[in-house]
Amino acid sequence: MLRTFRIGGIHPPENKLSAGKKITALATPKQVIIPLSQHIGAPAQAVVKKGDLVKVGTLLAKAGGFVSANIHSSVSGKVNKIDNALDASGYKRPAIYIDVEGDEWEETIDRSETLVKECTLSSKEIVDKIAASGIVGLGGATFPTQVKLMPPPGNKAEIVIINAVECEPYLTSDHSLMLEKGEQILVGVTILMKAVNVNKAVIGIENNKPDAIAHLQKLAVNYKGIEIMPLKVQYPQGGEKQLIDAVIRRQVKSGALPISAGAVVQKVGTAYAVYEAVQKNKPLFERVVTITGKAVANPSNFLVRMGTPISCLIEAAGGLPENTGKIIGGGPMMGKALISAEVPVCKGSSGVLLLTTEESVRKPIRDCIRCAKCVGVCPMGLNPTLLMNATEFQNWELAEKNYITDCIECGSCSYTCPANRPLLDQIRLGKGKVMGIIRSRKS
C-alpha cells in the first residue's frame, strides 16, 4: 500500500496540461530585471554599479546575512541602473536592471553536457560552494540551501528527503526535469548526502508520475543509498512536514524544524541546481518554469533566465488569451495573483497560471455552517474557522494559542469550504500579525 501523510489532505483536479512537454530554452529578452530579494532572509547587497559590464554567471550581489543568498547575472550586458522594481510580492523592491548584449558566459562555468559523477569536495567545501552559487530551495519558500545543510547544535541529519511530489495542480516543471535530467539529479542527491554526512536518501514522487518513477528507479540502481518511493496522490504532500510524515513516519512538532526529526528536505529542482553548482561551477541564474492554463494555446515548460518578464513566457506560449481574468504566480492552491505581467521570473518562480475570467470570479461568501470540513482537511490539524474568526476580531492571543503560525498556507481549508469563506486570506493576515508580535517580543 502506498504511503501518504496521515492528517488531513484533499484531492483537487490535477490539470497537468503541460505534462509530457519537453523543456525548451526561452529566448533571452532585451532587458532583465533581477531583484535583490529572491529568497527568505536578508536581501542581497549589490556589488555592481551602473555602467558595469557583466557576463552570464557574474556575481551581482552578495548575501546580506546568515540567512540570505548570492545573486548572479543571468545575461551578459551592461548594468543600466539599480532601482526599485515590482516583484511577485506586489511591492517595489531593489533590483538590478541589465541591458542584454550578446551571451558571453563566465569562463569558469562548464557548459558541456558531460555528466560528472565523482565529487571530490569535503562536506564543508560542498556547503561553501552551494552558498557561493546562490542556491535556494526551488519551491515557494526559497530558503537558502546552505543554511539547511548546517544543522543547529544538538541536531543531526539521518536522512535526505527529496521532494519530487509536485502536488500543486497544473505545475509540471519538476516532472519534466526528472524525465530529462534524472542522472544529474541523482548525482545532486549524492552531493547533498555527502554535505550532511548521511548514507540514506529517499526521493518521494506521487504515483501520478509513473514515467518519472520508472526512469529514476532504473537510474538509481547505480547510486548507493538512494531509494525512489512512490507515494499516494494527496495534496499538500509537498509540504516539508507532510512529506516527512509520509516517507519516514515521523511528525515534526509545532515550532520545530525538519532537522528535529532527523530529516533534511530539498526540492528535486534544488538537487539539480546543486549538481550544476558543485560539478559544473554554474550559479543559479535560470530555472524551469511552467506556463499553463485552460485557455493557454501552448502550455509549456520553459528554461528561463532570472529577471525575464512574465510577459515573455506568455507570448512564447501563444499570447495572452482574451478571456484572461488573472495571472497567478505559482499554482492555483498556493500561488498569488500578479498585478502585472512585467513581474520578473525569480528563483522561486515554479509556474505561471493564466485563469479565465470565469475561473477568476469569487463565489458569494456565506455564513459558516459549522460543518468542520476545513478542520478535517487541514494537514496541520488546525481549526481554520477559529483562526479566521480570531483574525477578524483581532484576537491575536487566541490566534497564537491555537497555533496560527503553524499554518503552511496550503489553501485546503478555502478549497473545501461550502460557504466559500476566505479562510486562507484571513489566516494569512493573522499569521503575519502574530509573527510580528512574536518577533517584537523577542527583540
Predicted feature residues:
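N-terminal, Lys/Arg-enriched amphipathic/low-complexity engagement segments
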Residues: 1-47
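Histidine-anchored nucleotide/phosphate-binding helix
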Residues: 179-195
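Conserved hydrophobic positions within beta-strands
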Residues: 77-79
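Hydrophobic alpha-helical positions that pack around
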Residues: 198-310, 316-321, 331
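Ferredoxin-type iron-sulfur electron-transfer modules in oxidoreductases and energy-metabolism complexes
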Residues: 349-365, 375, 379-443
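Acidic low-complexity segments
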Residues: 86-143, 154, 210
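Gly-rich Lys/Arg/Thr-decorated short loops/hinges at beta-loop-alpha junctions or inter-strand turns
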Residues: 106, 137, 160-174, 295
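Short, well-structured beta-strand-loop connectors
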Residues: 49-62, 81
